[in-house]
Design a protein with these regions (language model features):
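FAD-binding subdomain of flavoenzyme oxidoreductases
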Residues: 1-52, 56-57, 83
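A conserved active-site cap/scaffold subdomain adjacent to cofactor or substrate pockets
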Residues: 32-33, 41-111
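Short beta-strand-to-loop capping motifs
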Residues: 31-35, 81-87, 139-143, 171-176
């Protein structure tokens, strides 16, 4: 029976079925990093590689306890790189990226799709800062200047993590006055970047 046929039986001679492409998957390669400079190197190489990552972030050691995943077995600072696509393509590209970065198996962990999604949702939502009551800033600089900027502002007792493959520094500072904020702005300006106050 067809709609509007008033009970008349009909024969379908041709049927067109519209299908949607299968939803892509993702995994996250997590690398144990002892040094910020090495982490920035990994981010830079990853974003310019043929593995085509869709996310690249670095968390210092002080935020390590914010992530408790079954698949995350490493300690200390972490660099996380997300790869999206078909399952077979993802695994191949992660292997290729590990070879390009020259990292060993005992230095990495792989977050499977479900845990990978949670990790990146927490990153987008700035969850590591959710229980902190300090001032929150968004710093954007060329990736080549990130290390220098962090070296100069660390005297302000900053808590931070790095997103956008090295160009975005989310920064939390407990106590800051007008003089300190002006100095930080000047440091960032000299690094060809800018600062946005999110909460103060």
């Amino acid at each position: 029976l067809l709609c509007g046929s008033f009970g008349t039986l009909t024969v379908l001679t041709e049927v067109a079925v519209k299908v949607l492409p299968k939803q892509g998957s993702n995994k996250t390669l997590v690398i144990e990093n002892p040094h910020l400079k090495k982490a920035l190197e990994y981010l830079n190489i990853s974003l310019s590689s043929s593995s085509d990552p869709s996310g690249a972030v670095f968390y210092p050691e002080n935020f390590r306890n914010n992530f408790t995943f079954n698949d995350l077995t490493i300690n200390g600072p972490i660099t996380a790189i997300r790869i999206e696509g078909s399952p077979g393509s993802i695994d191949h590209r992660i292997t290729s990226l590990c070879n390009e970065l020259k990292i060993k198996k005992d230095e990495i962990a792989i977050l499977e799709p479900e845990q990978s999604n949670i990790f990146w949702e927490n990153t987008r939502g700035l969850k590591v800062f959710s229980n902190l009551k300090g001032n929150l800033f968004k710093i954007v600089v060329p990736g080549t200047n990130t290390f220098d900027v962090l070296s100069k502002i660390k005297k302000f007792d900053v808590k931070y993590f790095i997103d956008w493959g090295g160009s975005l520094i989310w920064t939390q500072i407990d106590k800051i006055d007008a003089k300190s904020l002006k100095e930080i702005r000047e440091i960032i300006k000299n690094a060809e970047g800018y600062l946005t106050v999110i909460k103060i």
